[in-house]
Regions:
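Ankyrin repeat start-site detector
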Residues: 7, 39-40, 72-73, 105-106, ...
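Intrinsically disordered, low-complexity regulatory segments in ankyrin-centric signaling systems
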Residues: 1-30
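Ankyrin repeat structural motif
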Residues: 20-28, 53-61, 86-94, 119-127, ...
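Ankyrin repeat A-helix N-terminal signature
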Residues: 14-19, 47-53, 80-86, 113-119, ...
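Ankyrin repeat (ANK) core detector
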Residues: 12-13, 43-46, 76-79, 109-113, ...
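A generic tandem-repeat structural signature
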Residues: 66, 71-88, 104-108, 113-117
């Protein structure tokens, strides 16, 4: 028998994912918990960020959604927005106080995620907001190394213009230049 979480609001959760703005507003007005975390630790804000639901993200923020909640793997809504390349959502999350240097359970940051996928507009926003360009994850990779691994030339150029350290070594003694 599956035990149902009494705090879970499927209507609200699905409305956030599907971008049903009127339903999201209605559910918030009816008392939906904007910071509820499911079994994986994910929130409605993470779900809306992942699905590029700009209006839903903003109404969640306006109603107290915590931008720095992390899921069971340490991922935040900011990391999701950076990975998806949604500059508007990324800026809204940063403006709401998201930690641009938060790390997931593998030590990866939103900047590293954006660099791996070549999301240059998000890379610029994160750097402008104070993201540390030379942070390294648990295997020693930096944002520059991630961009190099993925052959993201424009991202590499952008990081070099912003003084990314080309001499950092990962845990295997490899630099971004190797």
């Amino acid at each position: 028998m599956i035990e149902m979480d009494q705090n879970f609001n499927k209507v609200f959760w699905d409305a956030c994912a599907n971008g049903d703005f009127p339903m999201v507003c209605s559910q918030i007005k009816a008392g939906a918990d904007v910071n509820y975390q499911n079994g994986d630790g994910r929130t409605a804000l993470m779900r809306a960020s992942k699905r590029d639901r700009k209006d839903v993200v903003q109404v969640l923020l306006d109603n107290g959604a915590d931008v720095n909640i992390s899921d069971n793997k340490g991922k935040t809504a900011l990391m999701t927005a950076a990975k998806k390349g949604n500059k508007t959502i990324l800026k809204a999350l940063i403006d709401a106080g998201a930690d641009v240097n938060a790390k997931d359970d593998r030590g990866r940051t939103a900047l590293m995620r954006a660099c791996l996928l070549g999301q240059d507009r998000c890379v610029e926003v994160l750097l402008d907001a104070g993201a540390r360009i030379n942070d390294q994850d648990e295997v020693g990779r930096s944002a520059l190394m991630e961009a190099c691994i993925a052959f993201k030339r424009d991202t590499i150029h952008l990081l070099l213009e912003r003084n990314a350290d080309v001499n950092l070594f990962d845990n295997n003694g490899v630099t971004a230049l190797m």
